[in-house]
A protein has these predicted regions:
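Beta-sandwich interaction modules
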Residues: 16-21, 56-72
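Edge beta-strands of jelly-roll/beta-sandwich modules across compartments, strongly enriched
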Residues: 40-43, 81-91
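Noncatalytic modules at the cell exterior or secretory-pathway interfaces
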Residues: 24-31, 66-82
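Surface-exposed loop/edge segments in extracytoplasmic proteins
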Residues: 2-5, 49-55
């Protein structure tokens, strides 16, 4: 299982995460996130070349988990402020 760590910032604007290190193939992650009034951040991931997990833990966030095969995940945030997440992409 290969793991690649990246930093993204959760904002209301679309963000692109590029990870060239998984299995020697380039994988582009198009991340659109929205901070809701209840402190939820919805992340849509497109462009993953195989199924995997997208995880992140950071101050200001309770947890972050996205199932890449579903392409959608919910991040529970402690506040609506912008937070930086250390993201890992795990694949078997």
């Amino acid at each position: 299982m290969a793991t690649a760590s990246n930093n993204i910032t959760l904002t209301t604007a679309p963000t692109t995460l590029f990870d060239p290190s998984v299995d020697g193939h380039a994988a582009a992650f198009s991340i659109t996130n929205r901070v809701g009034s209840a402190g939820n951040v919805l992340i849509n991931i497109a462009g993953m070349h195989k199924a995997g997990d997208f995880r992140g833990i950071a101050p200001g966030l309770d947890k972050a988990f996205v199932n890449a095969s579903a392409g959608i995940g919910l991040v529970t945030a402690k506040s609506d402020s912008t937070a930086t997440v250390d993201c890992g992409v795990d694949r078997v």
